[in-house]
Amino acid sequence: MKHQVVFERQELFDVNMIIAMTFDVKGEVSSGALQEAFAEAVKCNEILNTKVVIEPDGSAFYVSSDEPESRLIITEEDLDEVRMREERIRFRIEEGEYIRAFVNLEEGGMKLLLLMHHMGGDGKSLLYFAEDLLRSLGGETLQFKEIRTAEPKGKLDPISRAIIRSYNRKWNGHVFTFPDMDEAYRAYWKDRKTTVEVEVLEEEETAKIREECRKAGAKFTAYLIARLIKDTKGKQDVGLAADYRHDGNRSMGNQASGTSVVYQYDTSKSIYMNAAAIQKKLDKKLKSEDSMSYILNFMGTLKPTLVDAVNLEHAGAYSDKTSAGLAKLLGFTGKTKDLSITNLTVADIPVVYGSFKLERIEFTGPVVSYGKNVVGVITCNGKTVITRHRRTDC
C-alpha cells in the first residue's frame, strides 16, 4: 500500500500536532485484556499499520509497515502531566508511531489517555479508535477500515491561485527530512510550554443552553464563539475546524477541514442573539464547498517542501525569504489567529460496551502553528467538556 500525503502535508512538519483525549471508563479491566484490545484496535485501522516516508524529491507517502509502533502503557502518573511531557517528544511517524496510550487502572474502572499525531487522523479518527478499543475490550470482533484522507471538492479563487503560483515559482525546492524535524522540535520546545484549562457544563446546564440556542436560531458552536469573544473589543477572527467526511465514514485519517468567522460582539444584545448572528455567518461558510475546502486546496496546491519550510519557519529551525513571506501571510509567524475551536459535538460512539460504560470524555486539540488558543469541545452522557489549550513561553 502506498498513499500519497497531499492535503495533510501541513501536519507533517508541524511541531505541535498532538490530539489528546481522556476517557473515564467504568468496569473492571485487566492490563492483559487492555493490551490485547489496544493491539486489535491498531490492527483493524490501516493507517496505524503504515509509516511515513519522504522521497528524495520531497514527496511523502504512507506506506505499509509490518511493525506498527503505536503503544499502550499502564502508569500511575498523573495523566495531565503525561500529556504535557509527551507533546514535546516527537512521534516517530517514520517508524509507524501514531498513537501513545497511557492508562491509570482504578478500582472499578480506568482513565485512558490517547495521544495521536495528526498524521494518524483528525479528532473524530481518535474518537473512533477509542470506540474500536472499547468494542474489542467488550468482546466484539472489529472490522478492518481502510485509510481515508480528505478529498476537497471546491475550487480556489483566481487571486489565491496567483499567490500560490508566485510562491511556488520563487521557492528553492529544499527537501527536508526527519532529522530536520528533530531539530525543529528542539528549537521550538526549548523555551515553550502549553497549559490546558478545563470547564465542565453539567447535563442540566448543557440542556438549558441548547434550548436557549434553539429558540434563538443558533447552534452550540455559535454560542461558544459568542461566549469566548464576549469580553473582547473589535472584530474577532475565530478559526473553526470542521468534519469533512462527505460519506460519514468512520475510517481513520485526516478528514478535517477548517474555516473562520469574523464577528464583533454586540453588547446591546443577549449572548444568544449574538450567537444567532454568528450562526448566520457560519451557515454561509459551511454551505459553500469553496469555503470549506479552501485551506485544504490552498495548502495542497503549494509545493510540498514549501509547506514543510513554513512549519520550520514557525519552529525557528529554518529561514528563507520565500518561506518567511508565506509563513507571515498564512499566520504561522507574526500575527497568528488568537482563537480556534473544534467542536466534536455529541460523541457519536456508544456509551456501553458489554460490562464497560463510558462516563466522560475530554478532548484537547493541538496548538497548531497558526493558532495561540485552541478550544476543544465534546459532549458525552449529556455533559459538555470544554478545554482551552494555550501556548505560552517558559
Protein language model features and the residues they cover:
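Acyl-thioester-dependent condensation/acyltransferase catalytic cores
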Residues: 35-124, 128-131, 135-138
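Non-catalytic, low-complexity flexible loops and terminal extensions
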Residues: 1-9, 19, 120, 124, ...
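Generic recognition of well-ordered alpha-helical segments
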Residues: 36-37, 131, 211, 226, ...
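Acyl-thioester-dependent acyl-group transfer interface
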Residues: 1-58, 79-99, 233-394
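Gly/Ser/Thr-rich phosphate-binding loops and adjoining beta-strand/alpha-helix segments
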Residues: 14-33, 95-113, 185-247, 383-384
